[in-house]
């Protein structure tokens, strides 16, 4: 066993290695609860969280913790493919947009007033679990703690395994401002599959904030990322399709989110719990992260007050298997995504779909959603996935 002297190291009750969405949500809720004032908490991240580096969206019925960070809401959304368009009435849900900097400011404006919480702008280089404590090294310092919450994603480890399919939700987005009023600020474009599919699952995603301003993202659910030029060429073509001739690009963003049912929680140990994408908090079948992380962070804060073993935190549900079925299909036949999502949204109740994606539906409601999907595809996926029942 490696022995590391902690004579000159500062010790914390909790260290968060990586301070992304999941870590910040969790620490914010720990502070809000008032139950952790006697616990010292350290957040470590190489990023200062002072730029508008990403956009999150989520749906909800009632107002929640992140209301101050929401910059735009929609009661209506558009779903489209090459053959049809459908206006989706989302009520009682609202579709919400959160810009990264607004979220960071909300969290840090609160937690940095807490005497027991520290944020250090350092890159984590090593994590070690010892007999009586855990150890974290950065490029310049070392720390010890009772428990580590790690959100640094092990990309190589996940992608090198072959048991579970791994796709990516990857995209480039442009925030643009046009000279002409061309957007409907009351309606988001949830998925527009009318773009050429090219053997993949490809769609445009449009979030208008005014009649002249919108975020347009070219998004894929597939295995391989594209060259930057291909994403941007597709965005340009879509802008032309909308009839926009004069516009300026205000900001750009890009991302790649793993979509997999890999059992991240099997790596949980006595003192280290993976959270966020590294812990399987991303919704595997869609890549949505904000709502799932909101739920999981609340569950974790409640869990920590029960003095239980970290390995008891995660519980696998029926939705894990549902996600696995879709990923199994897209892994084998990536070109079928538009067909599957179109079958769900063409005539289905969008509020029931949202409830299903939130993992809040009954078995009867599950059947209402799943029965709209191409039956033969899912029967074959079930047959291919029978081996997973051994670990379900």
PLM feature spans:
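N-terminal FAD cofactor-binding segment of flavoenzymes
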Residues: 25, 29-83
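C-terminal helical "tail/cap" subdomain of flavin- and related membrane-associated enzymes
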Residues: 298-392
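Beta1/beta-strand and adjacent pyrophosphate-binding region of the FAD-binding site
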Residues: 8-22, 42
């Amino acid at each position: 066993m490696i022995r590391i002297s902690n004579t000159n190291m500062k010790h914390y009750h909790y260290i968060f290695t990586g301070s992304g969405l999941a870590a910040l949500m969790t620490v914010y809720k720990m502070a809000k609860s008032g139950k952790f004032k006697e616990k010292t908490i350290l957040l470590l991240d190489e990023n200062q969280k002072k730029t508008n580096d990403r956009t999150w969206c989520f749906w909800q019925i009632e107002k929640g913790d992140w209301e101050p960070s929401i910059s735009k809401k929609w009661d209506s959304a558009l779903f489209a493919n090459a053959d049809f368009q459908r206006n989706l009435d989302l009520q009682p849900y609202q579709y919400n947009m959160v810009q990264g900097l607004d979220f960071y400011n909300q969290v840090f404006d609160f937690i940095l007033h807490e005497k027991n919480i520290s944020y250090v702008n350092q890159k984590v280089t090593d994590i070690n679990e010892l007999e009586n404590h855990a150890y974290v090294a950065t490029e310049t310092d070392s720390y010890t703690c009772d428990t580590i919450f790690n959100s640094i994603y092990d990309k190589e480890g996940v992608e090198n395994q072959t048991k579970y399919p791994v796709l990516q939700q990857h995209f480039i987005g442009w925030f643009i401002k046009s000279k002409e009023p061309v957007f409907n600020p009351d309606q988001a474009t949830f998925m527009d599959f009318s773009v050429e599919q090219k053997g993949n699952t490809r769609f445009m995603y449009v979030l208008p904030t005014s009649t002249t301003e919108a975020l347009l993202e070219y998004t894929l659910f597939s295995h391989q990322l594209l060259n930057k030029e291909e994403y941007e060429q597709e965005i340009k073509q879509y802008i032309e399709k909308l009839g926009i001739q004069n516009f300026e690009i205000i900001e750009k963003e890009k991302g790649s989110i793993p979509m997999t049912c890999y059992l991240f929680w099997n790596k949980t140990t006595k003192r280290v719990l993976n959270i966020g994408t590294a812990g399987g908090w991303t919704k595997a079948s869609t890549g949505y992260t904000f709502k799932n992380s909101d739920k999981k962070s609340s569950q974790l804060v409640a869990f920590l007050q029960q003095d239980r073993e970290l390995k008891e935190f995660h519980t696998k549900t029926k939705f894990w298997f549902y996600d696995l079925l879709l990923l199994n299909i897209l892994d084998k036949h990536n070109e079928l995504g538009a067909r599957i999502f179109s079958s769900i949204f063409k005539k289905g109740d969008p509020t029931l779909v949202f409830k299903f994606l939130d993992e809040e539906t009954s078995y009867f409601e599950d059947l209402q959603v799943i029965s709209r999907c191409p039956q033969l595809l899912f029967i074959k996926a079930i047959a291919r996935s029978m081996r997973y029942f051994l670990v379900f």
